[in-house]
Regions:
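S-adenosylmethionine
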Residues: 1-67
Length: 68
């Protein structure tokens, strides 16, 4: 489904991020809702900001690791 790498990054980042550390993901223009769902399933992350490119397309998401 093209999202498996995001699931892996979100899972493995927990092992290296400190509390309040940032996880910044570059995403495809049509992936925001799916990525938000992955992050929301992992309660340790809080979405801080959604980033758009100059064309107004979704291009990134910033979240904070809140700890295990």
């Amino acid at each position: 489904d093209g999202l498996s790498i995001y699931r892996r990054i979100v899972k493995e980042a927990k092992e290296v991020l400190k509390v309040n550390g940032l996880l910044i993901l570059e995403i495809g223009y049509d992936q925001l809702d799916d990525i938000k769902q992955i992050l929301n399933e992992n309660k340790e992350y809080k979405i801080i900001e959604e980033l758009k490119d100059y064309g107004g397309n979704d291009r990134g998401i910033i979240c904070r690791f809140q700890g295990k």
